[in-house]
């Protein structure tokens, strides 16, 4: 998960609502005052020790990129234990269960991701320092998984009935090179019907995402014959070509991102070569480019590819002998972008649900599982998992249960409001 710039949601939503718009704040007050919802809220508070136990157990099951299976199997078991008899693990590893509505109305998906960014072998043992629990991945997004389990328990035990179905999903492949593969599969043509989408990701209870940051990720590999640094001197050098590419890309992209919709670029990793005294046979770099705007992303993508071509041409012109260098441009990831109009009922309900708990909401931009439905035109948002925490994607990541129950109550209220309460 990635979180970016903040806009005050209260001011924006109030301005857009207008005199004729539905009163979503009143809708939330009325819904929250119903006996079954009040009971669900009480159950959430009573389940705080169980929620913490779930969080620790799941955190200590490693879920590196592309290796979420063990955690997914256990999460499916936990959903069954929470009261959902029909749980499936789909072809790519998503864990899915359906809370059935009474009328077959719109289907709402609530999604938290199973995977973490940490490689295999990372110590994920949870330890305590005061009120903090520390472990890689404990917040992002294991807390989201624990939150959903408690939402399920509270709905089942309280007797809440919804008009539409609520699909609870533990997704795979949200992080890094996973490229949102779990949600892309979930929303494939012929997949389960999903009309609205709520991702649970990110730390703060005030979070309401309505803009999805798109990204391209590439591996750029320059290749040549390679040889001895003395005896084969004069051959085209892939390392030199890679250096030229990085220089030219940074020069033009650095100017490009100064204006227009927010856009970023990064050379995150470079590698290649075999020895200090050997001309490499290949050198590579991994490139990440992001933007709030699809057209802007396309433009910086073109700048990157132009820099590749220029570097290849220049280095081949400099070689004194041997075959020309070649280059391979491999697309590693393509995260779609888009925007949900703040006046959309789902966004308005998310803002109102946040205000209901005395928190001023923030409209945000980010890169989450919600990117996919937003790009497909499905109303979608990402809300925070509650509590307090820092250090996402770092070994020192921590989470603390400071009013963490409010994040769970908000998630339940939003899910039920979106699916519709059955009378």
Regions from the PLM with identified roles:
Residues 115-128, 209-221, 352:
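Acidic-glycine-rich active-site phosphate/pyrophosphate-binding loop
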Residues 22-134:
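Acidic/His- and Gly-rich active-site-bordering loop/insert found
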Residues 20-39, 55, 239-423:
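Metal-dependent amide/peptide-bond hydrolase catalytic core
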Residues 113-117, 203-205, 212-215, 270-273, ...:
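Short glycine-enriched loops at secondary-structure junctions
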Residues 132, 137-213, 257-258, 264, ...:
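Acidic/histidine-rich catalytic neighborhood of metal-dependent amide-processing enzymes
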Residues 5-15:
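Bacterial N-terminal signal peptides
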Residues 62, 110, 114, 128-177, ...:
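Alpha-helical metal-binding/catalytic segments enriched in His/Glu/Asp
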């Amino acid at each position: 998960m990635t979180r970016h710039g903040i806009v005050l949601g209260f001011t924006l939503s109030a301005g857009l609502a207008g005199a004729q718009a539905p009163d979503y704040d009143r809708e939330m007050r009325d819904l929250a005052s119903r006996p079954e919802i009040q009971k669900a809220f009480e159950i959430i508070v009573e389940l705080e020790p169980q929620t913490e136990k779930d969080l620790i157990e799941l955190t200590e099951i490693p879920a590196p990129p592309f290796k979420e299976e063990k955690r997914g199997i256990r999460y499916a078991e936990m959903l069954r234990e929470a009261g959902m008899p029909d749980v499936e693990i789909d072809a790519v590893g998503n864990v899915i269960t359906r809370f059935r509505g009474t009328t077959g109305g719109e289907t709402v998906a609530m999604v938290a991701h199973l995977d973490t960014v940490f490689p295999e072998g990372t110590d994920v043992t949870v330890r305590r320092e005061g009120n903090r629990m520390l472990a890689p991945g404990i917040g992002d997004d294991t807390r989201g998984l624990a939150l959903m389990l408690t939402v399920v328990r509270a709905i089942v035990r309280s007797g809440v009935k919804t008009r539409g179905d609520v699909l609870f999903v533990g997704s795979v492949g949200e992080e890094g090179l996973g490229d949102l593969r779990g949600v892309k599969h979930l929303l494939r043509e012929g997949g389960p019907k999903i009309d609205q989408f709520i991702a649970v990701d990110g730390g703060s209870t005030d979070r309401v995402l309505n803009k999805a940051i798109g990204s391209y990720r590439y591996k750029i590999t320059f290749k040549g014959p390679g040889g001895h640094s003395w005896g084969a001197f004069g051959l085209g050098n892939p390392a030199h070509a890679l250096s030229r590419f990085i220089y030219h890309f940074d020069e033009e992209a650095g100017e490009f991102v100064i204006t227009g919709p927010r856009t970023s670029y990064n050379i995150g990793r470079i590698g290649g070569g075999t020895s200090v005294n050997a001309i490499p046979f290949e050198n590579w770099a991994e490139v990440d480019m992001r933007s709030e705007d699809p057209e802007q992303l396309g433009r910086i993508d073109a700048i990157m590819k132009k820099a590749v071509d220029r570097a290849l041409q220049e280095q081949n012109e400099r070689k004194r002998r041997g075959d020309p260098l070649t280059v391979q441009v491999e697309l590693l990831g393509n995260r779609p972008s888009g925007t949900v109009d703040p006046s959309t009922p789902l966004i308005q309900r998310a803002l109102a649900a946040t205000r209901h708990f005395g928190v001023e909401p923030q409209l945000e931009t980010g890169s989450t599982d919600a990117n996919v439905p937003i790009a497909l035109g499905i109303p979608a948002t990402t809300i925070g998992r509650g509590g307090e925490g820092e250090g996402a994607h770092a070994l020192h990541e921590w989470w603390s249960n400071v009013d963490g129950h409010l994040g769970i109550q908000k998630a339940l209220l939003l899910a039920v409001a979106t699916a519709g309460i059955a009378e």
